[in-house]
Amino acid sequence: MAFRGFDAAKLSTLANDLDTLGRNSGTLHSRLAALLTTVQQNLPPGQSASRNPDLQDLVGDLVPMPFFGRRRLPGSLGGELGDMQASMKRRIKQLEGLQELERRGYPVSDGTLFLDEQPPDPKKIDDALRHLQELQGKDFGTNGNRDDLEKISGELDGLTAGELDALMTKASPKDLAFYNQLLTNTDDSLLNPFDENGLPEDRRRDTLSRMLAKISPENVPKFQAAFPGMQPTFTNTGAYEDGGNDQNGQSNNGIHWATPGDPLFKDGVSADDINQHQFGDCWYVASLAGLAQKDPKFVQDGIKQNPNGTVSVRVWDKDGNYQWVTMTADLPTDQNGNPISTYGNGESWPAYYEKAFALVYSDDGDGERGYGGIEGDDPKKSAPYLTGKEGDDLTTGGFLGLGEHDDKNIQSLKKAFDSGKVVTVSTPDDESLEKNHPPEWEPSYCTNHAYYVRGFTADGKIILGNPWGSSYPPITVSQDQFDKYFQGPEAFDVP
């Protein structure tokens, strides 16, 4: 009997047939190759056993070699069909487990059907749900609640997508909200200043990211309501408070959350994909663009879209801990549906890198978090979050740290760039430079702004890219111009 469009019995028959075909493909390969080889041996020189090049390749290939050389049909079907039928059988068992789960009265969302995971275990769901509910009114003792929360996080991390989604559906909004309240409150109690409460931010975010990546789309709004800290605020940004970015002239009449229609990638990753738009985080976006230029594959491998539509980005936190940060797909958007945050040319991957950074970054000098917390800072501070490696000032002179100053020698920057490093520079906050820079740099030069190094000319000039995007052409700068109009060269290694 079909279950929401899936007929487990018919799928099992198909999987068994594929298994049989896969196991017989080697025999078919050898017989076909033997026939073609015999034909070839009985033909005059210069003639082929077959006009089909794929069949002609089988001449002499009597034994299919699955591990060495080029794999040819039909012998190569053994591995491919074997993998396919094994995956189908695992998914069928999961589907049958969901059917049984529903018969027992558990909620089952369509988004969890036919996943490649273990069948759901009702006891694991019941245990995790009971422990979640028991947090209400529980006496956590003198050592605080962290050990209890660690236990529940471990339980939640161990649930399959189907199990976790059933728990999310059955759990009350009140229980989920109280769990979030306990997770986020790390203060000591008044009676015992040495107890441990809540979970550290990285551990908390890791558990919630795993949950958000697994649950069905139907449960995402419920998750958002229970765990609002998994959405970075934009109400503390200049774009929200002032209606735009006064440096690049972009403006808006209001910001709201909306999901873009563009894919993560259209033509892979390129620095030219990146357009900073209205948030004032040029320091981060310049570093991201420089990294995309140096190692586009590293950037592309660091982001993925989950089956439920959420997006996960690879981020290191300020302590060097590596994790995948999961977020909903909606982005800050203006009244006309245009992106407010960093975006690409018909592709959305830069926006999610920025959103993940806004969730994680906690080093703002004013204590701000979210998008407002990543406005106006130092490019090298973004390096540990992007790569797990520290960024460095490029300096020269001095003794024992005294008297050092910016190394503005273009050849020094070229040496760092040629060694594989991402190199960024900044401009002073100087109104006179804003008014009196070389006209050929229009519209790309701006004071109090960050740039990334794109390359160097044969005659010793440096080429700088503006994170505002491809509408702002790279500028070519001589040594004298660099000394006057730029400062703060920094660099970081690419993994």
Outline where the language-model segments fall:
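N-terminal secretion-targeting helices of virulence/extracellular proteins
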Residues: 1-154, 162-169
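Helix N-cap and loop-to-helix transition residues
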Residues: 7, 160, 172, 216, ...
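Generic detector of well-ordered alpha-helical segments enriched in charged/polar residues
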Residues: 33-36, 56, 60, 78, ...
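Acidic helix-start/capping segments at beta-turn-to-alpha-helix junctions
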Residues: 35-40, 304-315
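Non-catalytic all-alpha helical scaffold/repeat segments
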Residues: 105-234
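Predominantly the structural core of cysteine protease catalytic domains
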Residues: 229-250, 258-295, 310-456, 463-495
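Surface-exposed patches in mature extracellular/periplasmic domains of secreted proteins
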Residues: 296-305
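Generic beta-strand structural signal
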Residues: 305-306, 456-458
